[in-house]
């Protein structure tokens, strides 16, 4: 499995490149540009615990894949996790798109708000990688 970190801001791509160790460079690649322009099996969504995909990167995904992505995610959250996908959990959602078939929803927050620490991002990343490995 290859992990691609995409950044539309050059400073972010530069920072990632500076902090990826040589060991990680075999499986982690940094790309400057949009993830939607690449041929990848899945994208990761940092949605919230209730699957609302109407802001930030999630809004871009909803625009690209269509509103059915949010609808599928919210249905899966209701049916598989009792109505809330906790930070540290992830779900694999079919996009319905011919090129990018999957979206891994791994919330970084329960409801939309700023993050005070890096822990939610760590937990979401861990959950997304585990979800991808299990697929």
Language-model features, listed with the residues they occupy:
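Macrodomain-like recognition of ADP-ribose-binding/processing modules
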Residues: 1-135
């Amino acid at each position: 499995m290859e992990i691609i970190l995409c950044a539309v801001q050059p400073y972010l791509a530069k920072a990632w490149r500076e902090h990826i160790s040589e060991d990680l460079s075999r499986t982690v690649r940094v790309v400057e540009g949009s993830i939607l322009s690449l041929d990848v099996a899945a994208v990761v969504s940092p949605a919230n615990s209730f699957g609302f995909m109407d802001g930030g990167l999630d809004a871009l995904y909803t625009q690209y894949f269509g509103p059915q992505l949010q609808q599928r995610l919210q249905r899966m959250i209701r049916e598989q996790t009792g109505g809330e996908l906790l930070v540290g959990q992830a779900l694999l959602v079919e996009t319905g798109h011919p090129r990018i078939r999957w979206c891994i929803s791994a919330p970084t927050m329960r409801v939309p708000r700023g993050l005070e620490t890096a822990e939610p991002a760590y937990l979401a990343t861990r959950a997304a990688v585990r979800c991808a490995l299990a697929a």
